[in-house]
Amino acid sequence: MIWHVQNENFILDSTRIFMKAFHLLLFDGSFIFPECILIFGLILLLMIDSTSDQKDIPWLYFISSTSFVMSITALLFRWREEPMISFSGNFQTNNFNEIFQFLILLCSTLCIPLSVEYIECTEMAITEFLLFVLTATLGGMFLCGANDLITIFVAPECFSLCSYLLSGYTKKDVRSNEATMKYLLMGGASSSTLVHGFSWLYGSSGGEIELQEIVNGLINTQMYNSPGISIALIFITVGIGFKLSLAPSHQWTPDVYQGSPTPVVAFLSVTSKVAASALATRIFDIPFYFSSNEWHLLLEILAILSMILGNLIAITQTSMKRMLAYSSIGQIGYVIIGIIVGDSNGGYASMITYMLFYISMNLGTFACIILFGLRTGTDNIRDYAGLYTKDPFLALSLALCLLSLGGLPPLAGFFGKLHLFWCGWRAGLYFLVSIGLLTSVLSIYYYLKIIKLLMTGRNQEITPHVRNYRISPLRSTNSIELSMIVCVIASTIPGISMNPIIAIAQDSPF
């Protein structure tokens, strides 16, 4: 009899939960329509994988790419709609969040063609790879719109778990396994640190979890200047610093970059930065509104450390991927300037603009590295010597992307940094901007050092890898080369006409 009553209660509770979930999805589902498209793409991939013995690989790529393109289209159709909070306060939709979602989708869309030939050559499992990329993208998109502490914790964990699996995708490679273990252990530690900071916020605000309600709760409890908020700020900054690869939480980055498959590195190098930047912008600007001076100081210190250490250590690297890892640590230091400046002086607009350019510059560079690695089997910087004599197109593409990363005019990277530094200067961040300018000049040195190697024509300096290099045909249908062309064009032309991009970014108030 007791068992029968308990069983009935369980059925009633389950029915209530199901009906509540159905009600939320029915009335609030339109707010996550772009995310639903990706979920539908995931289901299709799983169905094809479970029902087909001979997997039609082109269809798998087509479904993944189409899901991303359709999701981008849904975002564009929703542009300029009124900001809305849905799912009982868990999710917020506005133009600012949608720009970051667009950037994540753009990264994923460009990374799919970069992976095709690499996966075919290395005989990696294609379905699982695409599933992890789609799921990581989904986690990043939910993070951009997250409006409460639970969603802010769960969404990046979804992204992180897929990142761990992707970084260790080549299971027979010892370096890949080592990178995965380091990434997993340090990622777990950073997540614990982050959630500990959230617990201090939750307690100090009187039990609130929504971002804006936390601010109201801190006012009601008079805890907005308490030691508890300072503790929360320190722990959350450390956790976000890991996600952004900010010094001194950057140690995992070079090992993961070197040990992971190159298309995975290309994907993680941009999507993780975009998603973590969206998280940092929201978490610092809303719950820590009353502690702006404190978190400004913390981020300034971390940005200075990242710009100096990242660019100094990059000079000494012999691996191209490790060099780009340290370069990315320096690059995120520049992005932090926009976060510190905030919305009042155009800081967020300059950050978004530079992030868009960074996506094209970085993915273009990785496309060149993937092509060179597939044709030579090496990642050593010295082995790029004389590449121009064998493949001028690849050498020029790599040179343009590196020069844009360094910030040389008239490329996109120069105008992106110029606008970012100008906004910082107007906001009074003179020392931070000065460090940014000096480290940008320093970064040009190691980029030019690589370009000098590319263009060398002396036979004694050309390595056997380049001498035996497979020259690609003039007309190539290689998907990596197509992505590379798109990224190279995006790294050069937008710098000349970037006003529309800045206008769109400024039209998305926080």
Curated annotation (Swiss-Prot):
**Does Zinc-finger appear among the keywords?**
no
A Pfam family this chain is assigned to:
Proton_antipo_M
Q: What is its EC number?
A: 7.1.1.-
Query: What does the entry list under GO cellular component?
Result: chloroplast thylakoid membrane
InterPro entries, A to Z? NADH-Q_OxRdtase_suN/2, ND/Mrp_TM, Ndh2_N
Explain the purpose of this protein: NDH shuttles electrons from NAD(P)H:plastoquinone, via FMN and iron-sulfur (Fe-S) centers, to quinones in the photosynthetic chain and possibly in a chloroplast respiratory chain. The immediate electron acceptor for the enzyme in this species is believed to be plastoquinone. Couples the redox reaction to proton translocation, and thus conserves the redox energy in a proton gradient.
Identification of the protein by name: NAD(P)H-quinone oxidoreductase subunit 2, chloroplastic
Q: Which organism is it from?
A: Brassica napus (Rape)
Q: Which gene encodes it?
A: ndhB
